[in-house]
Regions:
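Serine-hydrolase catalytic core
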Residues: 185-268
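Primarily recognizes the serine-hydrolase "nucleophile elbow" in alpha/beta-hydrolase
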Residues: 107-109, 113-170
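Bacterial Sec-dependent N-terminal signal peptides
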Residues: 1-22
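Proline/glycine-enriched tight loop/beta-turn segments at coil->beta junctions
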Residues: 42-49, 218-219
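N-terminal cap/lid segment of alpha/beta-hydrolase-fold proteins
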Residues: 20-45
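Catalytic active-site module of serine/aspartate enzymes centered on a nucleophile-bearing elbow/loop
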Residues: 275, 281-297
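Alpha/beta-hydrolase active-site loop
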Residues: 90-110, 129
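Short substrate-entry loop that stabilizes the transition state in hydrolases
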Residues: 46-47, 53-91
Length: 297
């Protein structure tokens, strides 16, 4: 059997094992629009809610089958939910409203306000921004913690990285750079130099701001930031003109440094080697599960 076929078989079998735990799908309404979400419930009591936000273009099946953490969380009594939100580089108003409506419904249904937020790539950026939103708005929810995998957090840096990709790379990386530039300029009406306030207010973290921008709302939140900052891999496989400032690990490293200075000693920046660049697989599930159980107790 070829390696690719074997990988696909493992994913299919993993997902079918999750189906045995009854992956359910439902719909909600936000801003007059219907959204979908998918979830797995434990058979017994509900310890809390874990919302996992997928990366751009990632389907819920991939999230639930590719990370064994989801299965282990359900076994420990957590409800695991994967909503379908906009796959933007940041949390727009619609994404925030989707999460608000979803959370409101599930808190009422399960009778628990205990919440863990997690996400990968752009989903991690949305999860981070939503955590900040919950704190800034004093939402009556028990936010236990946040864990994210390689998200783009500082839109000022992301825009600059996009320009570098557009001007100095070829092929799909050049196209990605053009898409980043277009998406952010269309959303905010121009470049960071022209629309600094819009970029700062929509970023999860702004390294150039003394108060960290929205990151100041994370000072009391337990956080795990995961990344595999393999610049050699990036240069070899994507574009040899890319530098450290062009990868998302730059944001995570700077965010942890900022939060530690602010007194958040529960913010961990976890780097790996050989687990896969920009992948859910960066998370070691058993270790992460222990952390979630600890902060939820």
């Amino acid at each position: 059997m070829k390696p690719v076929q074997l990988i696909l078989l493992v994913i299919i079998l993993s997902f079918h094992s999750l189906l045995a735990q009854d992956v359910k799908s439902n719909k909600g309404n936000a801003n007059g629009k219907t959204f979908k979400y998918h979830y797995i419930e434990p058979s017994g009591g509900k310890k809390g809610i874990v919302i996992l936000l997928p990366g751009s273009g990632e389907r819920f099946q991939s999230v639930l089958s590719n990370i064994s953490l989801a299965k282990q969380l359900v076994a420990q009594g957590f409800v695991v939910i994967v909503p379908e939100v906009h796959t933007l580089l940041y949390a727009d108003e619609y994404s925030i409203n989707i999460l608000n409506e979803l959370l409101k419904a599930k808190v009422k249904e399960y009778g628990t306000k205990s919440l863990i937020l997690g996400g990968f790539s752009s989903g991690g950026a949305i999860a981070t921004r939503y955590a900040e939103y919950l704190v800034s708005k004093n939402v009556q929810i028990d936010l236990k913690g946040l864990f994210v995998v390689d998200p783009p957090l500082d839109l000022h840096r992301v825009y600059t990285a996009g320009i570098n990709m557009l001007q100095n790379c070829d092929g799909i990386i050049k196209k990605d750079g053009a898409n980043i530039k277009a998406q952010l300029e269309n959303a905010f009406g121009g470049s960071p130099a022209e629309k600094i306030e819009q970029y700062t207010s929509n970023s999860s973290f702004t390294a150039s701001s003394k108060d960290g921008g929205n990151a100041k709302f994370l000072i009391n939140v337990p956080i795990r930031l995961y990344s595999e900052p393999d610049l050699n891999f990036v240069k070899k496989n994507y574009c040899n003109k890319l530098e450290k400032a062009d990868i998302n690990a730059t944001d995570l490293e700077a965010l942890q440094e900022y939060l530690l200075k602010c007194g958040n000693n529960r913010c961990e920046y976890i780097t790996t080697s050989g687990r896969g660049f920009h992948s859910w697989n960066i998370i070691e599930p058993n270790n992460c599960l222990k952390w979630i159980i600890k902060i939820s107790s």
